[in-house]
Swiss-Prot record:
Its cofactor is Mn(2+); Mg(2+). Keywords: Cytoplasm, Endonuclease, Hydrolase, Manganese, Metal-binding, Nuclease. Transmembrane segments: none annotated. GO terms for biological process: DNA replication, removal of RNA primer; mismatch repair. It comes from the Bacteria. Coiled coil: none annotated. It catalyses: Endonucleolytic cleavage to 5'-phosphomonoester. Residues 72-255 form the RNase H type-2 domain. Its main location: cytoplasm. GO terms for molecular function: manganese ion binding; RNA binding; RNA-DNA hybrid ribonuclease activity. Belongs to the RNase HII family. One of its GO terms (cellular component) is ribonuclease H2 complex. This is Ribonuclease HII.
Length: 255
């Protein structure tokens, strides 16, 4: 018996590989609606495969470490907030769960806000462990942003209950006895670092919204401390807050 268009769409929705789709008897159905549904499903499957392939590529560092030690606890570490004029720098340390597959993970700057929020919830619910570390604006001014970032990363690492066997760090090195690999643009090359990037970003964004409630007029809830026009206008009208980095221009020239 010939399926209705809706019945055919349901059948197609349950096909999970291009190979099965191409061999399915529905390809012989010449009805326009059926052929359009097949084309749509083919595009969906190709996109899903592209996302999976990207995830597997980003899992390369983790896979190599696990090949050497299947029980290894691998910790990804990244930070957000080096460039803003206000607010702390925030680091996150993440140990992903065994058999993880958080499809869509990437550098937090490449992921939309809505997808970041979804991924952040999945990560918080699913990973083996995560922890945050902060360095304050005062510490940034005293130590410089690079050294303050190291402080934030070390604080995140120290909050973990489980001691990692290996660290994957985005373009930094830490003073620790734990073996580590520093990866340039690691948040786009390692799923563990990408997870840390997204979780740190969401944590810091929420923190800047709280600061915006305390100090309205700078639009911290939108610019998260970066030097937008609204932020600079706020500085000129309202002055410097305790959350501003006094070693960063134009604040440095205002003190």
């Amino acid at each position: 018996m010939t399926q209705t268009i809706n019945e055919a769409k349901h059948i197609l929705s349950e096909i999970n590989s291009i190979e099965v789709l191409e061999q399915h008897e529905l390809n012989q159905d010449v009805r326009k609606g059926i052929q359009q549904a097949i084309t749509r499903r083919r595009k969906q499957l190709l996109k899903e495969q592209e996302i999976l392939d990207h995830y597997n590529t980003m899992n390369k560092f983790e896979s190599e470490l696990l090949n050497n030690n299947p029980q290894a606890l691998i910790c990804g570490i990244d930070e957000v907030g080096r460039g803003p004029l206000a607010g702390p720098v925030v680091a996150c340390a993440v140990i992903l769960n065994e058999g993880h597959r958080y499809l869509g993970l990437d550098d937090s700057k490449k992921v939309t806000a809505s997808k970041r929020q979804i991924l952040n919830k999945k990560l918080k619910d699913g990973v083996l462990e995560y922890a945050y570390g902060l360095a304050s604006p005062e510490e940034i001014d005293e130590l410089n942003i690079y050294n303050a970032t190291q402080v934030a990363m070390n604080r995140a690492l120290s909050q973990l209950v489980n001691r990692p066997d290996h660290l994957l760090i985005d373009a930094m090195s830490l003073d620790t006895t734990i073996p580590q690999t520093s990866i340039i643009k690691g948040d786009a090359k390692s799923v563990s670092i990408a997870a840390a990037s997204i979780m740190a970003k969401e944590y810091r964004d929420d923190l800047m919204k709280e600061i915006a409630d305390e100090y309205p007029g700078y639009e911290f809830e939108k610019n998260v401390g970066y030097g937008t026009k609204a932020h600079l206008d706020g500085l000129n009208k309202l002055g410097i807050t305790p959350y501003h980095r006094k070693s960063f221009e134009p604040i440095k020239s205002m003190t």
